[in-house]
């Protein structure tokens, strides 16, 4: 289940993408339009900046804009940055693999086989859905 933090990050980034991405968008505008708590949004945007997804600009014309084109930022990039690995169990994680303590044999574990399929299908959908798709409501059914 996505955390509120991820949902807010997605909403903020989709909003920024919809503005065209040229001029920085003030945090006050993002917070007001998306009805997000400003202080929480500041923390989220700092994480997104540190993760290379947005750039920040100070001053009167300051705010946030995407660090790269919307078509090059996937839903998967955002969720991994905020949540961590997509895998539901550590033994199928690509980036945070850890053997399950209660597993006798990974190669024959039926739970692992199902979780691999879940991970692969989830990653395929999220990694192939960009902010450009979401900002234009072009998500495939």
Predicted regions and their residues:
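Residue cluster at the C-terminal edge of the helix-turn-helix DNA-binding motif
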Residues: 50-53, 81
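Key DNA-contact positions within bacterial/archaeal DNA-binding proteins
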Residues: 39
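Basic amphipathic alpha-helical segments that dock to polyanions
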Residues: 44-49
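A short alpha-helical element within helix-turn-helix/winged-helix DNA-binding domains
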Residues: 28-34
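Beta-hairpin "wing" of winged helix-turn-helix
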Residues: 52-67
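Non-DNA-binding regulatory cores of transcription-related proteins
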Residues: 67-141
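Short amphipathic alpha-helical interface segments
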Residues: 9-21
């Amino acid at each position: 289940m996505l955390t509120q933090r991820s949902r807010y990050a997605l909403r903020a980034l989709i909003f920024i993408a919809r503005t065209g991405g040229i001029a920085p968008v003030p945090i006050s505008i993002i917070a007001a339009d998306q009805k997000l708590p400003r202080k929480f949004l500041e923390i989220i945007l700092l994480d997104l900046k540190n993760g290379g997804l947005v750039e920040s600009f100070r001053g009167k014309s300051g705010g946030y804009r995407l660090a790269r084109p919307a078509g090059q930022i996937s839903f998967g990039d955002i969720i991994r940055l905020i949540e961590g690995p997509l895998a539901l169990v550590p033994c199928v994680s690509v980036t945070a693999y850890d053997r399950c303590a209660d597993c006798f044999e990974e190669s024959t574990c039926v739970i692992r086989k199902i979780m691999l399929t879940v991970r692969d299908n989830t990653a395929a959908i999220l990694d192939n859905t960009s902010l450009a798709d979401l900002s234009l409501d072009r998500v495939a059914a």
